[in-house]
Amino acid sequence: MSTVMNTQYRKPLPGTALDYFDTREAIEAIAPGAYAKLPYTSRVLAENLVRRCEPEMLTASLKQIIESKQELDFPWFPARVVCHDILGQTALVDLAGLRDAIAAKGGDPAQVNPVVPTQLIVDHSLAVEYGGFDKDAFAKNRAIEDRRNEDRFHFINWTQKAFKNIDVIPQGNGIMHQINLERMSPVIHARNGVAFPDTLVGTDSHTPHVDALGVIAIGVGGLEAESVMLGRASYMRLPDIIGVELTGKPQPGITATDIVLALTEFLRAQKVVSSYLEFFGEGAEALTLGDRATISNMTPEFGATAAMFYIDQQTLDYLTLTGREAEQVKLVETYAKTAGLWSDDLKQAVYPRTLHFDLSSVVRTIAGPSNPHARVPTSELAARGISGEVENEPGLMPDGAVIIAAITSCTNTSNPRNVIAAGLLARNANAKGLTRKPWVKTSLAPGSKAVQLYLEEANLLPELESLGFGIVGFACTTCNGMSGALDPVIQQEVIDRDLYATAVLSGNRNFDGRIHPYAKQAFLASPPLVVAYAIAGTIRFDIEKDVLGLDKDGKPVRLINIWPSDAEIDAVIAASVKPEQFRKVYEPMFDLSVDYGDKVSPLYDWRPQSTYIRRPPYWEGALAGERTLKGMRPLAVLGDNITTDHLSPSNAIMMDSAAGEYLHKMGLPEEDFNSYATHRGDHLTAQRATFANPKLKNEMAIVDGKVKQGSLARIEPEGIVTRMWEAIETYMDRKQPLIIIAGADYGQGSSRDWAAKGVRLAGVEAIVAEGFERIHRTNLVGMGVLPLEFKAGENRATYGIDGTEVFDVIGSIAPRADLTVIITRKNGERVEVPVTCRLDTAEEVSIYEAGGVLQRFAQDFLESNLK
């Protein structure tokens, strides 16, 4: 659990007082000439091994990289852990619970601390209760955030003082990924006299945002983050590394959002699941760092694990622009050029697979409904059935009404070109006399306070404010479902008329039900298009062709008349985006001095009435018991593309939900129910979110001969269809072991550990699916739930699974072993189903057998401290 470095291959780094590890020499000692052919990712992973791997494992591990083999697990030691306040807080609740468990067994709780530097940014808890047309929206939304989250923030403040090695950036300062890009990542570290590449894991699937800097940053679940925090290696096999050559240059008026939505469609079709992508070529070299970051941010939407760019002059220019010290920028250049991470040194890199994408093919685009990879060129809105006749009855909202238009998300607000484009479009629209439609709830929520400074410098913030896009917060807001309440009159009209209402946002996900319960569908668009849709007021509007309004002379105004030119965008950036703005924001923010005193108890004083923070139960009762994998009944039989939003939603809690009823019983007023996400530190609230998504389709929930959509289950053997939570409670009372049967891509979406915790607390012991998304599979293992995969070409339909059956798993559990699921049907017939055990490494088997990572931590800690 230490952070010890090796000594072999350690050398002085030319032109500095630092040392570095000469990975090239280590590779060449095994295979002369091999280093020049290695992809960027392989070089960074190899450096990590040379510096940290146990010497006796080094040669075998490096050979996997040199020979592009995937036969051996090797350790990876990320330099940092970054967390947001939902999963980060949940992880810290687990660590506080671990301290209690250690103390109960006679250990010293104060010894439980993160070993790896950990940064927690509070960005997920602000709801847009007041829209951007309210001049005091920011202050009002922040006050509500503090009131609703007092329990959570009390706990987070305690952790900052009680745990070593944790830095906390409090609420109201920005979004984790954008702060990571603009400030936290040094690209190259200088620690203990050694220079080495920044690498990290983050408790959010969009952590790869900083891959744009050439930093390997991957999203993990909270459980895996806890493991890394405590100094454990993250074991991996060499990932598939795919080169993506970008050619051509974007057409005039095309934004990075258009490019990334086109890439999302292209890469999803190319099946890049779990791979590390490396973008190169003339097209990649010409992209600004902001444009690269927009691309890297949407790595999970591609289905990939990482989306890397090489270090080059664009990287250095961006580090300078964002106020990094000149000495640090020089270190990045020196290290990259010495260690072979500079773009020129990668001309001979060989990729097992290379894809080609022409940037000049990209046209103006939105994505939706329902999926980020459902790309629609704006020139084809009518042909695709999205735009159509706009029915504007006086005094009523039109069909397809845009009820939310949000410039939001680190995906786009970390890119000055996208933000400035929105400001210029707003200025042009104001000059033509155009206005926002009154039913559109508009908001601007940048991921960094620097955005406000450069918009003010360019005199564009007032232009956005006059169209209702005032700053409502510096947080994730609408992008993670915290879009806040609608005007009650508008909401009632949506309900009464069963209106097809929509949201348009510059975010990265648009799954049904995610953005707002009353926005039936959502579309992703660039910030300037979001402004245009607020003026149009309906998704039925053909944004390229229809008339947005009449100017002061009565002439029709279309999108083309207000869209800013690339030259103007670039000129405004050159004049208005400055390093001192970033320094002014970040220097005070990172002046972190924490008093670690004897005054703070190492054990948290849990508040018994809290619905936000509660001592976790993972070391006691049934969760400490054995899983037999026998006599399991299905809790749900599900189709393809089940997301973590289905498994444990994040959005607002409704009174008629199981969690809402519980919070009401606990005395919370409905307006302070907050979101599911904010209650994940309290397992009693959070477990009631399991499968609580109203869009769930559980194939067992058959009513009148059809599958009924909703948070529903069927209790067996009675065959009673009921709300999911009532079914879970019934099975918990019976101590009935459960199983879930699912289709392909099970668990895609956010890296939400409660998507695994919830099913484990319900009594689920195994999940059989056609395929698992990477982070969710790891979380299942971390909770002691066995992931099993149907053999290729087989699925639930092959075996006619309807939910009346009982399931057993037999065979010896080992990495990727062949196991057998025995199905016993209602009539007594037994069927054998061959499956693959998706515990992929020996380390995962050991975690599973311990009951999960939290149980394993406690065992290991007590053993090491009682020796």
Curated annotation (Swiss-Prot):
<dbReference type="GO" id="GO:0046872">
    <property type="term" value="F:metal ion binding"/>
</dbReference>
<keyword id="KW-0408">Iron</keyword>
<dbReference type="InterPro" id="IPR015928">
    <property type="entry name" value="Aconitase/3IPM_dehydase_swvl"/>
</dbReference>
<dbReference type="InterPro" id="IPR001030">
    <property type="entry name" value="Acoase/IPM_deHydtase_lsu_aba"/>
</dbReference>
<comment type="similarity">
    <text>Belongs to the aconitase/IPM isomerase family.</text>
</comment>
<dbReference type="InterPro" id="IPR000573">
    <property type="entry name" value="AconitaseA/IPMdHydase_ssu_swvl"/>
</dbReference>
<feature type="binding site">
    <location>
        <position position="476"/>
    </location>
    <ligand>
        <name>[4Fe-4S] cluster</name>
    </ligand>
</feature>
<dbReference type="GO" id="GO:0006099">
    <property type="term" value="P:tricarboxylic acid cycle"/>
</dbReference>
<keyword id="KW-0456">Lyase</keyword>
<dbReference type="GO" id="GO:0030350">
    <property type="term" value="F:iron-responsive element binding"/>
</dbReference>
<dbReference type="InterPro" id="IPR012708">
    <property type="entry name" value="2Me_IsoCit_deHydtase_FeS-dep"/>
</dbReference>
<dbReference type="InterPro" id="IPR036008">
    <property type="entry name" value="Aconitase_4Fe-4S_dom"/>
</dbReference>
<dbReference type="GO" id="GO:0016836">
    <property type="term" value="F:hydro-lyase activity"/>
</dbReference>
<comment type="pathway">
    <text>Organic acid metabolism; propanoate degradation.</text>
</comment>
<feature type="binding site">
    <location>
        <position position="479"/>
    </location>
    <ligand>
        <name>[4Fe-4S] cluster</name>
    </ligand>
</feature>
<dbReference type="Pfam" id="PF00330">
    <property type="entry name" value="Aconitase"/>
</dbReference>
<keyword id="KW-0411">Iron-sulfur</keyword>
<keyword id="KW-0479">Metal-binding</keyword>
<dbReference type="GO" id="GO:0019629">
    <property type="term" value="P:propionate catabolic process, 2-methylcitrate cycle"/>
</dbReference>
<dbReference type="GO" id="GO:0003994">
    <property type="term" value="F:aconitate hydratase activity"/>
</dbReference>
<dbReference type="GO" id="GO:0051539">
    <property type="term" value="F:4 iron, 4 sulfur cluster binding"/>
</dbReference>
<comment type="function">
    <text>Involved in the catabolism of short chain fatty acids (SCFA) via the 2-methylcitrate cycle II (propionate degradation route). In vivo under anaerobic conditions, AcnD catalyzes the stereospecific dehydration of (2S,3S)-methylcitrate (2-MC) to yield the trans isomer of 2-methyl-aconitate (2-MCA). AcnD can also accept citrate and cis-aconitate, but with a lower efficiency. 2-methylisocitrate and isocitrate are not substrates.</text>
</comment>
<dbReference type="InterPro" id="IPR006249">
    <property type="entry name" value="Aconitase/IRP2"/>
</dbReference>
<feature type="binding site">
    <location>
        <position position="410"/>
    </location>
    <ligand>
        <name>[4Fe-4S] cluster</name>
    </ligand>
</feature>
<dbReference type="Pfam" id="PF00694">
    <property type="entry name" value="Aconitase_C"/>
</dbReference>
<dbReference type="GO" id="GO:0005829">
    <property type="term" value="C:cytosol"/>
</dbReference>
<keyword id="KW-0004">4Fe-4S</keyword>
<dbReference type="InterPro" id="IPR015931">
    <property type="entry name" value="Acnase/IPM_dHydase_lsu_aba_1/3"/>
</dbReference>
<dbReference type="GO" id="GO:0019679">
    <property type="term" value="P:propionate metabolic process, methylcitrate cycle"/>
</dbReference>
<protein>
    <recommendedName>
        <fullName>2-methylcitrate dehydratase (2-methyl-trans-aconitate forming)</fullName>
        <ecNumber>4.2.1.117</ecNumber>
        <ecNumber>4.2.1.3</ecNumber>
    </recommendedName>
</protein>
